[in-house]
Each structure stands twice: as C-alpha cells, then as structure tokens.
UniProtKB/Swiss-Prot annotation:
Its EC number is 5.4.99.25. One of its GO terms (biological process) is tRNA pseudouridine synthesis. Belongs to the pseudouridine synthase TruB family. Type 1 subfamily. Responsible for synthesis of pseudouridine from uracil-55 in the psi GC loop of transfer RNAs. SUPFAM superfamilies: Pseudouridine synthase. The keyword Hydrolase does not apply. Transmembrane segments: none annotated. This is tRNA pseudouridine synthase B. GO terms for molecular function: RNA binding; tRNA pseudouridine(55) synthase activity. Pfam families: TruB_C_2 (PF16198), TruB_N (PF01509). The lineage of its organism: Bacteria, Pseudomonadati, Thermodesulfobacteriota, Desulfovibrionia, Desulfovibrionales. Keywords: Isomerase, tRNA processing. It catalyses: uridine(55) in tRNA = pseudouridine(55) in tRNA.
Length: 309
C-alpha cells in the first residue's frame, strides 16, 4: 500500500529487478511509496533480471553523468536452433533449424568473436526511436522498421557452460549494448539461429548485484527505504567532493564559476574536464561541476545544479 508519509528520498536505489515486469512497472510500484520524483537509468527488458538503477529525487538530474562511459556486465543463456521476431524467448517463433552440426569449440570461438568494437544491429522490438516513434510500436503495428545500428564495445566475452543447444555466457560491454543482438548474430554465424532465453545484469556502473535489493523486500518494508538508498553524494564515487563556504555557495547558485584551488586537488593536477561534486557548507550536494578556463583562469563551471528541491 502507498505510504504518502514517506519522505522523498534523494539518491540511488540499486534494485534487483525480477523477471517478468517491465522496468516502468517496477518504477511505478516504488513511486507509490511517496516517491513522486523518480526515474531509472538503463532499461531492462521484461524477461531480464538484475541491476536496475532507480533514481530518486535530485538524483534524477544526474542520470546522464551516472551512465556516462559506464560498463555493464551481463550473464545469460541462449538457445541454438530457432529464431523469433524479438530475438529472445518472449517472441513469436519465426524459424527452427538443425543445430547438431555445431560443436562446443564452434560456440566458444563464436562467443570470443563478440570481443572488440563493432556496429551492432538494433532489434526491431526495442525502445530505440525512428522519427520519434519507438521501434517496438512500429513492429507491433506491422509497419516496416528501419535497420538501425549503433557502435558498441565488448571488453570481455566468455563462455561459461555449453550444454547444446543451450549456451551460458558472460559479457562486459558498453552502455547501450543489446544482448539479444549478440545472441542473434551468434546464431547467424553458426548457421542455425539462436535466441536469448535468460539474462541477468550483474553490474551497471558503478553498482553491482551484490548491492541490489529485491523489489518484493522494498515494497514490503517501506520504512526501510531510506536505509536502502545510496545518497546522492555517494552515487558518483569516483568524482572528487569539494565543500564550499556559504559565500561560494551563493555565488554558484547565481551562476558564477567557482575558483579552482590547487591545494584542494593536490593529487590531481589541473586539466580541463575534471569533474567533481560541489557540496554546500552542510555537506549536501550543491552541483556537478567541471574544470575549465575562463579568461585564462582555471575555474569550476557548473554542469548541473542540484539545489532545487
């Protein structure tokens, strides 16, 4: 039941999304716990489970910075010998094929070939947009979906187990990688087709499944929500934190850059593009900032103000 008395939280709730519901459905249920300002970073398909970053309060403002350059780790299972319209187990079967010519060595080589940079085809049933419309809506309406690709990076791919026609694997990949597409391409390479049957997101930069809370627990124990939320100032663990004086806080709120003090950043010599979280005198997040030159003077410029409640 919704608890309107719960205070709005400001931070990241690392959720262990269960298999079945959409990411949006999970968010809607948590919203009923008095969390009117809520969002998420990195959608998971309904058939997938694992790390879903739920952004609460002021943390909804940092989604782009939280995800920037962040790696994801997935483990999953694919099945050889069939194809579906969605490239996973949830879709309508389009074809079946004999897979018995495929050996374990063939599978291991094919998984190894995922590693590196490539242009990946985006599934027709996806949230990627064409002229403002999600591709999945066009596909469901029977309309032609344009072939879209995106640049991805797989830093590591490994075969965990082979029990043909099933293959378990793990990949370390860039944000935006479609694991369904990897399964589909592997099936094409082996000449028998393949679909994704299971997917677990084990890591979404900078949080892992070990830090995640089950949705049922979050909903059953609303009074524990605050203790489960990672505060905003800790949501960007690799960003330096700088506490400002009251006078400097006022200047930042008025849109003025904050002077760069080399003594505050002794371990990191000045270069343009260093990012930090500016804190107010009480230690609460005030703004995200980045180093730059203004009139040849090194300063911190505000990327995103966090002081509005």
């Amino acid at each position: 039941m919704a608890d309107s008395k719960l205070a709005q939280q400001h931070g990241v709730l690392v959720l262990n999304k269960p298999k079945g519901p959409t990411s949006a459905h999970c968010i809607a249920r948590i919203k009923r716990l008095g969390q009117k300002k809520i969002g998420h970073a990195g959608t998971l398909d309904p058939m997938a489970q694992g790390v879903l970053l739920v952004l609460l309060g002021q943390c909804t403002k940092i989604s782009g910075y939280l995800m920037e350059g962040g790696e994801k780790i997935y483990s999953g299972t694919l099945e050889l010998g069939r194809t579906t319209d969605t490239w996973d187990d949830e879709g309508e079967t389009l074809s079946t094929a004999d897979w018995t010519h495929v050996t374990e060595e063939d599978v291991v080589r094919a998984v190894d070939l995922w590693t590196g940079s490539s242009e990946q085809q985006v599934p027709a049933y996806s949230a990627a947009k064409h002229k403002g419309q999600p591709l999945y809506k066009l596909a469901r309406e029977g309309k032609e979906t344009p072939v879209k690709t995106r640049r991805i990076e797989i830093s590591q791919a490994e075969t965990l187990a082979v029990e043909l026609p099933f293959v378990r694997f793990r990949v370390h990949c860039s944000s935006g990688t479609y694991i369904r597409s990897l399964a589909h391409s592997l099936g094409n390479r082996l000449g028998c087709g393949a679909v994704l049957t299971e997917l677990i997101r084990e890591y979404s930069h900078p949080f892992s499944l070990d830090e995640a809370h089950d949705l049922d627990d979050v909903l059953a124990e609303p009074a524990e929500l605050a203790g489960r939320v990672i505060p905003l100032d800790k949501a960007l663990p690799h960003w330096p934190k700088l506490r400002l004086s009251a006078a400097d806080e006022a200047r930042v709120k008025n849109g003025m850059p904050h002077p760069y003090d080399p003594a505050e950043m002794a371990s990191m010599p000045f270069t343009e593009g260093i990012r930090a979280v500016l804190l107010d005198p009480a230690g609460d997040p005030l703004a995200l900032a980045e180093t730059a030159y203004r009139n040849q003077v090194p300063v911190w410029t505000v990327l995103r103000g966090l002081w509005n409640t």
